Amino acid sequence: MDPIIIVGTGLAGYNLAKEYRKLNQERPLMLLTADDGRNYSKPMLSTGFTKQKSADELALADAATMAQQLKAEIKTFVQVSAIDTAARTLTLNNGETLTYGELVLAWGADVFRPPLAGDGVDQVYSINDLLDYDRFRKAVEGKQKVVIIGGGLIGCEFANDLSNGGFQVDVVEPLGRPLPTLLPEPASAAVREALEELGVVFRFGPHVKGVEKRGASLSVVLSDDSRVAADIVISAIGLRPRIQVAKDA
């Protein structure tokens, strides 16, 4: 019997596999993931500095442990490049072809990356999974000043976390207040006040148009041509659902 294939080992993918195994212990089950397949709680990514936890400490179980618990095969560091719904096959980025009985796409979303000019864009990080968090945590070691692009939910969560971790944080938000699309003005004002009490500096109005290197530091260039000094930058301006492969199927 061809397996059920779940693409994605995040909260949705692993929870689906756990619930399915409560109903059926025998059906072949395979999970595919673009990362290392560790099980973790994604909301914890924006609490790691407050709790002083590394990526390894945020992980709940590795892929081998999850495979054993779920009686499943887990393929790590692979991506689906094409789906043939008529043949019920997947083509992976390594050229492998897999046949499925049923297919579940639980692969989440990609970060939206703004078009930025300058030679410092390689110091702009997005944190969307545990490997991203690990890379950022290693990169920020020994640094002090963080500029966050975006004052929405993720931007404010990281501003809070990094401030608690002892970093100086500036947040650039063009729309004039934190969480502008999620909260009414009184609640937004309360969030702003609480974060400013932690030392967070909000810069409302202009957007970020570039990041330039200035020796060992960075200069974040805003649309009004003002500049903000930084050691490292986080882009937190939103996510886009991963739908292109499914649309092409």
Labelled PLM ranges:
Residues 2-72, 161-182:
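Beta1-alpha1 glycine-rich phosphate/pyrophosphate-binding loop at the start
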